[in-house]
Regions:
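Proline/glycine-enriched tight loop/beta-turn segments at coil->beta junctions
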Residues: 116-122
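Short substrate-entry loop that stabilizes the transition state in hydrolases
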Residues: 132-137
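Residue in the alpha/beta-hydrolase core beta-strand immediately N-terminal to the catalytic nucleophile
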Residues: 197, 201-202, 231
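The conserved beta1-alpha1 loop
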Residues: 125-129, 201
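C-terminal motif of bacterial Sec signal peptides marking the signal peptidase cleavage site
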Residues: 13-16
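Sec-dependent signal peptide recognition
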Residues: 2-9
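Lipolytic serine-hydrolase domain surface
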Residues: 18, 22-101, 110-113, 138-142, ...
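Gly/Ala-rich beta-loop-alpha elbow adjacent to hydrolase catalytic centers
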Residues: 182, 200-204, 208
Length: 364
């Protein structure tokens, strides 16, 4: 009975806040000297024909590509999304100030960037998780891109989540439905010379790992090798399933990063719904089995349990790390760094290692 009560509280927390609707995607006039973020979008959602730039939860039979320019308000606080309450106002809220549809070729060219740019050929792909609408995924990526201040191209792979707490099973099917389309996007980027970093959250982590596994089984090693790094944030993946996936997946050039929290309430609900013993996103870095998993599967496991949560479920802490992403990337790209578990004691805080750490995670 106590477990059912906890599950009820989690569900209430996940669904209690008012959700932003497609009206937040209305294109408005930019404010003077506004900071902007350009996001490339690849989605297999069905477009909402009645609302420009909006998408439904329907599963589409083809990919749609676009470029969306988002204005960040002057008073923006790191890790927050200043949602508009009515018509978007760039002075106080995130706002779309430009949008255009793209062909697949245009998408790939824009993703590669200018030859003389320091970010040439570098991109970050965000694969959202369960219970996300198109606008929520779009603005979350814009927030992370704005906070990180890295020049890499921001790319959203948006799969058709129901954006409903009760849509867990449907979302699982939609994530599986999206595997081929994510593989297509990765192939297009690879052919254009783009080396992406993939940040996949929650159920999106399952989608990302499954897609890389699929590419490996198809012999598409060139595409797999083009991935600069794979970061799994609060991955909603059963531990046994993750082991099985990685056993037939070509090893990436860098360790796969797992951002985990022992107190992730959403993953606790997921485990209950799926009947799973443990998920990768709730690994305990003090457990010897976690050490074994990290060393065997080429993982860097980061405990982010002390990073502030944005909505009380402790499932969204990854968004708070965007501000220190350049330092995180520097730490993980250290060529002498070994795999093993890392402990992040808060944003910009100290790093300790219960078993192996080859290099500092955060540049001090």
């Amino acid at each position: 009975m106590r477990q059912l009560h906890i599950i009820f509280l989690i569900a209430v927390t996940l669904s209690s806040c008012a959700r932003p609707g497609p009206e937040t995607l209305a294109v408005v006039t930019p404010a003077p000297r506004a900071h902007t973020v350009e996001v490339l979008v690849a989605t297999n959602r069905v477009p909402d024909t009645g609302k420009a730039g909006a998408y439904t939860a329907g599963r589409g039979d083809r990919l749609h590509y676009s470029e969306v320019t988002i204005s960040i308000p002057p008073g923006h606080r790191p890790s927050k999304i200043e949602w508009p309450t009515a018509r978007p106002d760039p002075k106080v809220s995130f706002a779309v100030i430009g949008r255009r549809d793209l062909t697949a070729k245009e998408f790939s060219i824009l993703a590669r960037g200018q030859a003389k740019s320091p970010a040439y050929g570098r991109a970050g792909i965000f694969v959202h998780g369960y219970n996300y609408s198109h606008q929520e995924a779009l603005f979350r990526l814009a927030q992370m891109a704005a906070d990180s201040k890295v020049p890499d191209r921001a790319i959203l792979f948006d799969w058709p989540s129901q954006a409903e707490v009760t849509g867990y099973v449907a979302d699982k099917d939609s994530a599986a439905f999206a595997r081929d389309d994510l593989a297509t996007v990765l192939a297009e980027l690879s052919q254009s010379g783009v080396r992406p970093t993939i940040l996949a959250h929650s159920m999106g982590a399952w989608l990302a790992v499954e897609t890389v596994r699929q590419l490996s089984l198809m012999g598409k090693r060139d595409i797999v090798r083009s991935i600069d790094q794979l970061v799994l944030a609060a991955p909603d993946i059963d531990i046994d399933l993750l082991r099985k996936q990685l056993s037939v997946t070509d090893r990436l050039s860098k360790p796969i990063v797992v951002l985990a929290s022992k107190d992730d309430m959403a993953l606790a609900l997921s485990k209950r719904l799926a009947g799973s013993a443990a998920t990768a996103g709730s690994l305990d870095i003090d457990d010897p089995r976690t050490r074994e998993l990290a060393l065997k599967e080429n993982l860097d496991i980061v405990d982010i349990s002390t990073v502030p949560s944005l909505n009380g479920t402790n499932h969204d802490r990854f968004a708070s790390l965007a501000a220190v992403y350049p330092q995180l990337r520097q730490g993980f790209s250290n060529p002498v760094a070994g795999t093993g578990a890392l402990v992040l004691n808060g944003v910009g805080g100290a790093v300790s290692a219960p078993f192996r750490l080859g290099g500092s995670l955060l540049a001090q």
